Amino acid sequence: MGESALEPGPVPETPAGGPVHAVTVVTLLEKLATMLEALRERQGGLAERQGGLAGSVRRIQSGLGALSRSHDTTSNTLTQLLAKAERVGSHADAAQERAVRRAAQVQRLEANHGLLVARGKLHVLLFKEETEIPARAFQKVPELLGPEDQLVLGPDQPEDEVGESSEEEPVESRAQRLRRTGLQKVQSLKRALSSRKAAQPTPVKPPRVGPVRSSEGPSEGQPAAQPEMESELETALEPEPPQPTKEDPEKPVLQIESAA
């Protein structure tokens, strides 16, 4: 390109083979200088363009690096989210299994409760004493019994059977238990009545001049009425013999005795 611009062309003014004038040489040098200046300007513009392209390329490379880093961060976040989702799924499956098991247990409990309610074969027998009885009275009956207590026992139960401990006879019948509680009630009432009699002081009455039949009448009838009251209490507290009942072998019977 430079060589073609520097090639001198034919000068029409000068004849071929004639002498070259100085003016022609000067004009040719001026043209050459202007061409060189234009070439330098073009080279500077090309260098500036090349620098701009290099800057844009560097900016593009930095953008690509940031994009790759953000892509790596996003991939790591997605991996963590997937792991958390798997853990949550496993926990949800375990919770669902537990809920199913609990629902089955609740259904079984409801069925058992309905069956128990439908049967209604649970009976609770409560024995409550009016006076406090020691716990040893349930294990062994006192050996010394009065004649009245022996009459209440009757011929069905000998004294040897009453004196046996609970260790020798762990299983007691219902009739024996009722009879024993009745005897304990009678004994407690007798002790209460005897203590009440001993605590009451005999009032001292002043002597009267008139007839004493009206005043002595109630005092003579009072000790006669006292044994009658004791006999009535004994007959009322005497346990009735148990009647034979047909018990269902499948029916559970719960007996609770309270000494309070």
UniProtKB/Swiss-Prot annotation:
Localization, UniProt: Cytoplasm; Cytoplasm, Cytosol; Membrane, Caveola
A Pfam family reported for this protein in Swiss-Prot or TrEMBL: PTRF_SDPR
Start and end residues of each stretch annotated as Disordered: 146-260
Modified residues (Phosphoserine): S62, S70, S165, S166, S173
Record location of the Glycyl lysine isopeptide (Lys-Gly) (interchain with G-Cter in SUMO2) cross-link: K128
Tissue expression pattern: Lung, heart, skeletal muscle, liver, brain, vascular and urinary bladder smooth muscle (at protein level). Strongly expressed in uterus, ovary, mammary and epithelial cells. Also expressed in spleen, intestine, kidney and testis.
Keyword Coiled coil: no
Disrupted-gene phenotype: Mice show reduced density of membrane caveolae in the arterial smooth muscle and the urinary bladder but show no loss of endothelial caveolae in lung and heart.
Composition skew (Acidic residues), residue ranges: 157-170
Region (Leucine-zipper): 20-78
MF annotations from Gene Ontology: protein kinase C binding
Gene Ontology CC annotation, any one: cytosol
UniProt keyword annotation of Membrane present: yes
Region (Interaction with CAVIN1): 1-84
Annotated region described as Interaction with CAV1, given as residue ranges: 135-200
Post-translational modification (record): In vitro, phosphorylated by PRKCD.
Subcellular location, principal: cytoplasm
Keywords: Biological rhythms, Cytoplasm, Isopeptide bond, Membrane, Phosphoprotein, Tumor suppressor, Ubl conjugation
Induction profile: Up-regulated in serum-starvated cells or during cell growth arrest.
Biological processes per GO annotation: circadian regulation of gene expression; cortical actin cytoskeleton organization; negative regulation of fermentation; negative regulation of phosphatidylinositol 3-kinase/protein kinase B signal transduction; positive regulation of ERK1 and ERK2 cascade
Record text on subunit structure and interactions: Component of the CAVIN complex composed of CAVIN1, CAVIN2, CAVIN3 and CAVIN4. Interacts with PRKCD and with phosphatidylserine. Phosphatidylserine may form a bridge between PKC and PKC-binding partners and stabilize the binding. Interacts with PER2. Interacts with CAVIN1. Interacts (via leucine-zipper domain) with CAV1 in a cholesterol-sensitive manner. Interacts with EPS15L1.
UniProt cross-references to PANTHER family, sorted A to Z: CAVEOLAE-ASSOCIATED PROTEIN 3, CAVIN
Biological role stated in the UniProt entry: Regulates the traffic and/or budding of caveolae. Plays a role in caveola formation in a tissue-specific manner. Required for the formation of caveolae in smooth muscle but not in the lung and heart endothelial cells. Regulates the equilibrium between cell surface-associated and cell surface-dissociated caveolae by promoting the rapid release of caveolae from the cell surface. Plays a role in the regulation of the circadian clock. Modulates the period length and phase of circadian gene expression and also regulates expression and interaction of the core clock components PER1/2 and CRY1/2.
Entry's free-text remark on domains: The leucine-zipper domain is essential for its localization in the caveolae and for its interaction with CAV1 and EPS15L1.
Name this protein carries in UniProt: Caveolae-associated protein 3
Organism expressing this protein natively: Mus musculus (Mouse)
